[in-house]
Amino acid sequence: MSDIVLHEDIPESLLPGGEAAAAATHTVEIDSHALNFGPQHPSAHGVLRLVLEMEGEVVARAIPHIGLLHRGTEKLIEYKTYPKALPYFDRLDYVSPMCEEQAFALATEKLLGIDIPDRAKWIRVMFAEITRILNHILNLTALGLDCGAVTPALWGYEEREKLIEFYEAASGARFHANYFRPGGVSRDLPAGLEDRIAEWARQFPAWIDDLESLLTNNRIWKQRTVGIGIFTTEQALAWGFSGPCLRASGVPWDLRRAQPYDNYDKVEFNIPVARQGDCYDRYLIRVAEMRESVRIVEQCLAQMKPGPIKIQDHKITPPPRREMKRSMEALIHHFKLFTEGYHVPPGATYTAVESPKGEFGVYLVADGSNRPYRCKIRPTGFAHLQAIDEMSRRHMLADAVAIIGSLDLVFGEIDR
C-alpha cells in the first residue's frame, strides 16, 4: 500500500501549521437549537414528545407535549354504568391495571356504604403487590435498556411471564383483568394457584439478587445514574411527587401505611427511603419495594382463609351461575346488573391508592343514578412529567433519557 502524496500545487499556507489553517480553527459559539425527542423514539416510553432546547450536547430546556394518547376516558365513564366503567381503569396505567381498578372499586364501595368480605380484601392486597412487582420489573429493565444494559430486560420478561400467568389464572386475562369489582373480586382463586404463588415467592428474592449483581455496583450503571436528575425533598413536595419518586427524595410517605385500605393495616412491611433523589436512588427504591412486596404476598397467603369473595347482595354483585339455572330471581338479578347496573346514592368521595408509580386517585361524584355524574382521575405520572424540565437542565442529552426512564411514565394514565 503506497503512501498518500499531497498535490504539488497546494500552497504551504493551507498545509497543517500554515496561516490559513490556523485562521480556520478559531472557536465558534454554538447557537442553541431545538431537538424533537419522540414520540416515535423507543426511549420515549410510549407517546412522549419532548422539545429539547439544546446548547450543543447540553439540555437548556425540556418542554413535554402531552395529549397524543388522549381518549376522553373521564367523559366516557359518565356514559357507562358503574360495572361497565371499571374496565376503563385497566387501560389507564396498562402496566399496573389491578391497582387502578382498586381505586375505582374502593370509591364506589365507599359511596355504596358496603364492606367486602375478608378473603376478597386479602386477594386484592396480594394481587396489588404482584402488580407492583410486575410494574417495577418492567420499569427497571426498560431503564437498563435505555442506558445500554440488555441482559436485565431478557431476564425481566421471563420473570414477568410467571406473574402474568397468575393474572390469567385468576381473572382469565393477561393484562386487562377487570378482576377487582365493587363488592369484592370477580371470582375466587382457582385450585392450586395459591401454592404456585407461594413457590414463586420463595425463589423471587434470588432473582432480585441476580438483577442487583448486574446493576447495583456496576460502575457504568452508576456513572449513568448517580447524580443525574437530582430532586431535593423540598422540590419533590412542591411539585407534587408521590410514590418511589417522592421516597427517593427522602419523604417516607406511603398510602398503604398512612391511609390503609383493604387489609394493608394487617401486614408488616418497611417503607424504603433514600436521600439523594437521583436516578440511582429511584432505582434502589424500586428494587427494595419488590423485596417488601414479596413479604406482603407471603403474609397474604398465610392469613387468607376460605370464605366468600364478594358481598351477597345480588343487586351489586352477580349471583353464582349455578343459582341462575334454577332460580328466576337470580336470573333477573344477573340481567338487571349487566344491563341497568345499580344506583349509587348521591355523594362524592376522593379515594386514593398507592399504585406502583405513586398516588393514583379517583374523585367520584354520584347523583343517585346508575352512572357516575363525574369521575376525575388523579394520575401518578402527571406531576412527575412536569418536572422533566427542571430535572433535565444542564444535563447531557443521554442523561435526559435516563431521567425519563427513572420517572416511570405511562401515557395511558397521563393523557387519559
UniProtKB/Swiss-Prot annotation:
One of its GO terms (cellular component) is plasma membrane. Gene3D superfamilies: Cytochrome-c3 Hydrogenase, chain B (1.10.645.10). It is a peripheral membrane protein. It catalyses: a quinone + NADH + 5 H(+)(in) = a quinol + NAD(+) + 4 H(+)(out). One of its GO terms (molecular function) is quinone binding. It comes from the Bacteria. Signal peptide: none annotated. Keywords: Cell inner membrane, Cell membrane, Membrane, NAD, Quinone, Translocase, Transport, Ubiquinone. InterPro entries: NADH_Q_OxRdtase_suD, NADH_UbQ_OxRdtase_49kDa_CS, NDH1_su_D/H, NiFe-Hase_large. SUPFAM superfamilies: HydB/Nqo4-like. It is found in: Cell inner membrane. Its EC number is 7.1.1.-. Belongs to the complex I 49 kDa subunit family. NDH-1 is composed of 14 different subunits. Subunits NuoB, C, D, E, F, and G constitute the peripheral sector of the complex. HAMAP family: NDH1_NuoD. NDH-1 shuttles electrons from NADH, via FMN and iron-sulfur (Fe-S) centers, to quinones in the respiratory chain. The immediate electron acceptor for the enzyme in this species is believed to be ubiquinone. Couples the redox reaction to proton translocation (for every two electrons transferred, four hydrogen ions are translocated across the cytoplasmic membrane), and thus conserves the redox energy in a proton gradient. This is NADH-quinone oxidoreductase subunit D.
